């Protein structure tokens, strides 16, 4: 049945306006973004099929364009709408960790990094620059692609730290596989960065590895002394 034929107030857009977005299911929220379905499949049914196809919202939003657009009812326009929504969510998270904010709550840092990196289909190595009071200076994405000990250059990290006058840093990267367990290469990178930063008297507070639903902290495991 087409959504326009549903009882008044039951369509996803009407329900959102009447009750608020929190009252909508994942499929209903996605349907609001998609706006319409295709022949024989309304927007909610299309949204539900997309979520099922990719195994969840996060996997759908981080899927590459060719994987999404190959499905019936989803073209470049709908793909662009989904990507815009995902980017807005990341930017909201970025505003929550504003310049000058003191990182006294580890959960805030985890939530921020999860929103920034968990939905990427490629590896990103980034750095959170802090001042001597552990206030945020800037979050910077440094490297993209396959992250290993050969592709992360300590001198570039040191150069950025000096440029921004940071006193401490948290480095982080994601695992597109969704598994946050650090590799031996991750541990080697961390040791090289810690030693390089020590030469300019800057503390490496942590290296966080972001998976689909968890973050592994090197500091919590005692791997950064």
From Swiss-Prot:
Transmembrane segments: none annotated. Zn(2+) binds at residues 173, 175, 186. The keyword Methyltransferase does not apply. PROSITE patterns: MPN, UPF0758. InterPro entries: MPN, RadC_JAB, RuvA_2-like, UPF0758, UPF0758_CS, UPF0758_N. Belongs to the UPF0758 family. It comes from the Bacteria. CDD domains: MPN_DUF2466 (cd08071). This is UPF0758 protein SO_4248. One of its GO terms (biological process) is proteolysis. It holds the Pfam family RadC. The lineage of its organism: Bacteria, Pseudomonadati, Pseudomonadota, Gammaproteobacteria, Alteromonadales.
């Amino acid at each position: 049945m087409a959504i326009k034929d549903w009882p008044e107030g039951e369509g996803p857009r009407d329900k959102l306006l009447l009750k608020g977005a929190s009252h909508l299911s994942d499929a209903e929220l996605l349907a609001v973004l998609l706006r319409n379905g295709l022949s024989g499949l309304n927007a909610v049914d299309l949204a539900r099929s997309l979520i099922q196809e990719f195994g969840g919202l996060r996997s759908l939003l981080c899927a590459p364009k060719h994987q999404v657009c190959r499905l019936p009812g989803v073209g470049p326009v709908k793909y662009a709408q989904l990507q815009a929504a995902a980017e807005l969510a990341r930017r909201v998270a970025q505003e929550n960790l504003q310049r000058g904010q003191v990182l006294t709550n580890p959960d805030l840092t985890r939530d921020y990094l999860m929103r920034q990196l968990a939905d990427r289909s490629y590896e990103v190595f980034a750095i959170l620059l802090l001042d001597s009071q552990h206030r945020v200076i800037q979050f910077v994405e440094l490297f993209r692609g396959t992250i290993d000990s050969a592709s992360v250059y300590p001198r570039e990290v040191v150069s950025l730290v000096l440029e921004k006058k940071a006193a401490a840093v948290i480095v982080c990267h994601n695992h597109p596989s969704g598994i946050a367990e650090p590799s031996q290469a991750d541990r080697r990178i961390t040791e090289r960065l810690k030693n390089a930063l020590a030469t300019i008297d800057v503390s490496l507070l942590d290296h966080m590895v972001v998976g689909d639903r968890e973050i592994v902290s090197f500091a919590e495991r005692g791997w950064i002394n």
